[in-house]
Amino acid sequence: MNLKYLFLGIAIATFTVTAKAIDYVPQNTSASISLKVPGNIAKQYPLNMQKLQNDGSAYLLEASESIPLIVSQRVENIDGKVNIKVCITALEDVYFNYNQQVSTGFRHDDCQFYMPGFWYRRNLRSPKEAPSFHTSDSWLVREDRLSAPLTGIYCEKEKSYMTVNRLDAFTDDALTTHREGEVILSGKTSIGFTGFENKNGTATLSFGFPYREAPRTYIRKLTLAPEVEAFQFLKKGETVLLTWVLAENKAEDFSEFIQHAWEYCYDTYSPKPVETPYSIADMKETMSAFFVNSLVEKHPLVFNSGIHLRTDECHKNGQAEVGFIGRVLLNAFNALEYGWENNREDLKNNSTKVFDSYLKNGFTPAGFFKESVNFDRNTEDPVHSIRRQSEGIYAMLHYLAYEKENGRRHPEWEQRMKTMLDMLLQLQNADGSFPRKFNDDFTIVDKSGGSTPSATLPLVMGYKYFKDKRYLESAKRTAAYLENELISKSDYFSSTLDANCEDKEASLYAATATYYLSLITKGEERRHYADLTKKAAYFALSWYYLWDVPFAQGQMLGDIGLKTRGWGNVSVENNHIDVFVFEFASVLQWLSKEYNEPRFSDFAEVISTSMRQLLPHEGHLCGIALTGYYPEVVQHTNWDYGKNGKGYYNDIFAPGWTVASLWELFTPGRAEELLAK
């Protein structure tokens, strides 16, 4: 028997022979393998698919010249999807990179593209310094950049889509000495690549193993480097088995496509809660150390120092931010509430100092919050953001409602908040949107409406607290804008303050905003807002990891056992994971009941348990200097915010917002309780 067929028979004997579903034929697919001899430029060998006799689902992939590998493929039809099982066996010691393309048959110009947590539509909201169509209409990326190892292509003209995803145990990664060019891996990796390419005007799914990134690799914030191609060592006689799944279906629009893709990925990768030793009570008790140790009292404003800290020191500084990223006022309220619940006089007293100082010294001449003050430099940001102003009002309305519930009133604060809500009404545009940034005299700095949903929350809360219907009407107008410009167009962007691109927070805030309106309305109106919440929630969910990316030995996050499922990618520009969740888990729990969808509540539990893993405490500091200062920029792929790379944090972080986010995660149903009173 021919040696090639002997190896082939051994490798695929256990596979089941079934018919194909998608039109998977040699004319619609191509494959190649690149081989590298150390010290030499790799050579690529196109592979021809030769169907085996008497076996309609098995192929031998042969090069036109002799190569020291046997490459075979079996195609199986399982539940209407095509499983592609590739077997690569080494006849000699080799370094290889395998890649394959499958044509969708769609015109590339008619398509929108999707790589979960990283690529939405054409990424045209992103700057040219980040991956987008501004640079190229074809992109290949390593799988660990994505919240699920999948690429989808949606044809708007045909209302059809095709996806490819990989199945594996995903247990290994390996270090390399270089981040670009042809690189030989120092060991085994489980990370392949996926993406889309324009092949003569036709949209094509591309995938392979080990990883490759082209035409650029995104290695640092706003830094594209030359492409990279990794080569895996395969010893003579060893075999690698790789599995990809192709699927195609119909979807009325891009939003419905995202829903189908997320549900498929959720069912495929089936993320389960992460076991940790920390209860919710443990988390709050440990994080409360941040409230105590970060307090700064020597300036006109009293605040928790929670931004721009060094991870290896956590020394306090003089920078105070009302909203994101410091969340000074929300932290003060959380500390106050926790202090009353647990008889912590220190927390109650500290929070009172924060509130009193902001009431006295925390407002601009026009009456807005001094949202970002740097006492170290004696500067104050003259530009306001709708997001930070809204987050400040949100925190204070929680505070006022809590105090009122317990028999304590603060008339000066009430008047300040009513004045600010009235000022928001002046800022609102005719289409219901709010400008992203503006000056103290109400002149507009950035008219973009992507941050609009952040204002919906305090407007609904203001209506509930002050019984002023103008605030509810304003909130409903924001929802009309969200529906018309973001949700219906599947275009969620510009919510973060340190990036202006497609991001998780825009869809998360949109879902939370319409959730608030669902809680305060009735009948058909309530159902309409609930439907919008559900639609936006799928986009937010698509940013959260459904699998555990592997780390190499020596990368701290892997060495301490981090499981990435349940963590959220941030944005196209900021390709790291974090614990930004706030009330979103409560939104998911509510949606689960409203629509009888257990995936929502089940995944909320995955998020809740997974985000407990990096709790810093004595003996388990997780690379952070102080107990309770929860890490922020968690770098899980070949990217960094500026320092340290995969497996580590950036050297600067902002525990002010991470503690606030987790605190709301572990205080479920807060909005429902507030708005039901």
Segments predicted by a language model, with ranges:
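Well-ordered alpha-helical scaffold segments within catalytic/enzyme domains
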Residues: L329-E345, E391-R409, S454-D468, Y509-E525, ...
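Bacterial Sec-dependent N-terminal signal peptides
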Residues: M1-I22
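Beta-strand/loop-rich accessory regions of lumenal/periplasmic or secreted enzymes
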Residues: Y24, N40, Q53, A63-I67, ...
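Low-complexity, Ser/Thr/Pro/Gly-enriched N-terminal "stalk/linker" regions
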Residues: I22, Q27-A31, K36-P46, L234, ...
